[in-house]
Amino acid sequence: MALDIIRYRLHNQLLSQTKYTQPGQVVEQLGAVQSQDYAGAKWALAQRVKDVTTDAAIDKDFNEGKILRTHVMRPTWHFVAPADIRWLLMLTAPRVQAGNAFMYRKLELDKAIIRKSYTVLEKALQGNKQLTRSELGSAFKKAGIAAEGQRLGYFMMSAELDGVICSGARQGRQFTYALLEERVPRVKPLKRDEALAELVRRYFTARGPATLQDFTWWSGLTMADAKKGIELIKSQFVSKMLDDQSYWFADSTSPVHEKSPTAHLLPNYDEYFIGFKDRSAIGKLVSPLHPEENSVALNAHIIIMDGQIVGGWRRTLSKHAVILERKLLTELTRSEERALAREADRYSEFLQLPVEWM
């Protein structure tokens, strides 16, 4: 079953096959894509479209609002589709806000000051303005609200979670914020059970075979929600038992047999890795007997060979090239080295820069 899990997940995660031509379609299929590492998250999307797209092309989609980046789960930034942002926030934001309560108290952010901060944001951003965090910090200061460091960050996160603001276009390397009401046209709202069923459906379609524990880890929702959600959509899914755990996946899935060996240079927060509480299925070469060695190899991005983690990689960008450094957990065969070289060529095409290995 472990090998089946790998084959199904590579297929469902759009790594061994894909029908999508646009990065935004990938975001919608996956439901949400972790993106605090913006550069890595763009590469995660690029690997899941039919034809090689470029870093600049995804920047363009992001700046045009075809892909949004906001706090929605766990809590960290995720890429989400504009049509999904409101029902996702309705479903997941209350849990994140509850988890943030300690920091709100520590930073003296009570309901009154948070409401006042929303008024400041609405006034500063109305008229389709898009401002950086530092510019909005200045707006808070003018309004007599202390907002520096963590305090500013939690003001902004709360406003994202409550659907006041979302991502705007980047200004150079800086992110901006926009009013959600102006950035994203309203669509017919979903009821909570409809939203729950939709999130569960997308999770197990795009990440199955997976367990309910995997879903609760990824979504931040409760086990009660997970069980209710699977009941709502289970006619479209099947489950198989492994080690006394039920693994759910779409009934219609027919995974392809990927050419072996096949390599993937995945970013550190790729959904193939971070989308599961239990990552043991892809970590057969990660030995618990050598934690220091594992840490050195895996403290950046991860190298996948035929679905298994075989090492880690880092990148250093210059104007004329991208320098890649790798740390392996196992020696690669010649055919695996060639597979890795092909993947590096894809990365080169994505960045529009030559790749050099250290």
Question: What is each stretch, according to the model?
Answer:
Residues 112-129, 192-208, 230:
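Positively charged, polyanion-binding regions of nucleic-acid-associated proteins
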Residues 196-251:
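Active-site-proximal binding-pocket segments
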Residues 285, 292-358:
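Glycine-rich, small/acidic residue-mixed loop/short-helix segments
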